UniProtKB/Swiss-Prot annotation:
Keywords per UniProt: ATP-binding, Cell cycle, Chromosome, DNA replication, DNA-binding, Helicase, Hydrolase, Nucleotide-binding, Nucleus
SMART domains: AAA (SM00382), MCM (SM00350)
Record EC number: 3.6.4.12
Record bears the keyword Nucleus: yes
Listed Basic and acidic residues bias regions: 693-702
Domain MCM positions: 295-502
Organism: Xenopus laevis (African clawed frog)
Compartments in which it is found: Nucleus; Chromosome
Protein name: Zygotic DNA replication licensing factor mcm3
Amino acid sequence: MAAVTELDDQEMREAQREYLDFLDDEEDQGIYQSKVRDMISENQYRLIVNINDLRRKNEKRASLLMNNAFEGLIAFQRALKDFVASIDGTYAKQYEDFYIGLEGSFGSKHVTPRTLTSRFLSSVVCVEGIVTKCSLVRPKVVRSVHYCPATKKTIERKYTDLTSLEAFPSSAVYPTKDEENNPLETEYGLSIYKDHQTITIQEMPEKAPAGQLPRSVDIILDDDLVDKVKPGDRVQVIGTYRCLPSKQNGYTSASFRTILIACNVIQMSKEVTPVFSADDLAKIKKFSKSHSKDVFEQLSRSLAPSIHGHSYIKKAILCMLLGGVEKVLDNGTRIRGDINVLLIGDPSVAKSQLLRYVLFTAPRAIPTTGRGSSGVGLTAAVTTDQETGERRLEAGAMVLADRGVVCIDEFDKMSDMDRTAIHEVMEQGRVTIAKAGIHARLNARCSVLAAANPVYGRYDQYKTPMENIGLQDSLLSRFDLLFIMLDQMDPEHDREISDHVLRMHRYRSAGEQDGDALPLGSAVDILATEDPNVTSEEQQELQVYEKHDSLLHGVKKRREKVLSMEFMRKYIHVAKIFKPVLTQEAASFIAEEYTRLRNQDQMSTDVARTSPVTARSLETLIRLSTAHAKVRMSKTVQLQDAEAALELVQYAYFKKVLEKEKKRRRREGESDTEEEQTQPDGEGKKRRKKRRAQDGESHDPYEFSDTEDETPVVHTPKTPVNGQEEMETDSSAKPGLSGDRLKAFKSALLDAFKAAHAQSIAMAAMMEAINKNNDSPFSQAEVKAALELMEEANHIMVSDNIVFLI
């Protein structure tokens, strides 16, 4: 037995010497010597070693390390400590241990949780998966120091368990007495502890076989590896595979629990902060200066280029990705800078595709669905820890997306209780939990991009937007912009969409030949921690524009160049850093337009609001103006930014409503009807208006006058509503009062109410006010006819010669 132990020690010393030779490569390229010096300067104690370098220099030792990991890693770490001591002796004494992390090509040992079988026990493996669960970080004792007051001596004891690399676990009991039964005092300040965390990673859904549930494996993280990952991250974990015996009734059972003791964790998810070179920044600066007039149009057009149309929605999503400026006042009040957008519309209008594009573009984005997530799943949940049985908090999607975007699809399918759970997050940017003895406040400063279908499945144009949307005002007011996306029957528009979609389906990437069958399975798996193709791509210079492809981009137009996604991502990242300040001109414009928005539909008869205009709408205008200024990389918010924000808001806030066709008796002969049908379109509309005016029917506030007898084709307003009102003609004009005169009367009456600063005005005062400075004054008959019409439309009420504004 002694001979075997001596042989093991000799082998260990031999392995340690070979590893030391590998690290001391000053005569060769000096890679690892410089790495160790960098590690010392950064105050780290884990060295990342590429297994390919060890394989190239000492193939036998690399093979032994891969297949007999525990002894190999212990020898490697001892060699590292000796090498650090030879470079900097004082630094080597600061830490109890130095650690080795591995990377490189693992070949057959590059596995998923499903293919991690018993033949890999005691080997180094690389496992890919998605982190599903993270435990709390707890301290674990490594060495305890005890002092005996009677003998004035100190005793040290080291502790190891089955999650350590050492072969034999030690006793976990603290000594309380020495050999002579003298009591001992534990010196906690001199004892050494290490951080300890358990995570669970699950097989990636794209790697799992069809029709089978993904499998998972437990990972042990120690020291500097703790808190490197969070739930939802895609990771590669390199470590040693070990089994832990489980006891039943005092006896070790034949079934074992397996764990992976990690020595390195590599993130596979996209980087939150892209890497910038000086050339990249120069290109971004040059682009913003050379396209100073149309930079907003250019960027929004390059957003989701595979989706045709929806230009206003793309502009809103661009503003959402940039966000406004968050303000925290001295008294603790927080004014949010995140922009929330809600898309409501018919099926198949590319709502989910827009959400998916944001997931690929935004630096941090978390996807959820309405039925697949609960209120606590979105905010935070109180769960029971499996190891200790304690209650603890688990972060939900919105907490994980802090400073990012949450994309919620099928928003209308969520229950009301779950929807109310996100009220606080959307306005305050935090989650407050007070349950099960836990009171906590978590940051959730994220933008919300939600997509929903209308109440009736499809949008009913004969009902108001509020009836179609079916969400509470308290929730709608928290969305900065609400877009109604309609699937309209327009032959020209349908032709453009079909041409665009067919081109997408005909497109093939550069490596494919025409006529070749596309592979059904996934691409070839790279059995290494680094993809060699990715490194070559990173060395290429940043392309500002996508290379033009006739199938992807259609007929080449000089002005319609599409920016590359990588350039978009970097441009957005740089633009977000700016914090523009409102100028006086922009501030006064926003204040004036906000008051106009509040009074917009008092006199308008053909549009309805999609969401309530509250004080939050004023903040919306400020946030959108700031985002537009960020696109220009400006330090101030100018008037043009405020005008662009107003255009977006007016497009999103107002929606036209149709009135269903009413069956009326024919009051004219058959010959008149035939005459009408043969009339040109414009004359026919005039005649219908005239006939309706003679009938003197009551006028509905949400009524279209010129589309009563036709199939409704409703377009969402693309110009500010003020312009639309001027184009509309009122069909309810009585004989002797034209539509223009009625409109002029309404405008004059509204001005009179504003001047009086009151909700009621006497008839005599009203007559004087509307005819003051008027080139064509209103007669008594005209005023009477106009008041009757407005009273029928529920705009005003006349009583005792006093006009009341309703």
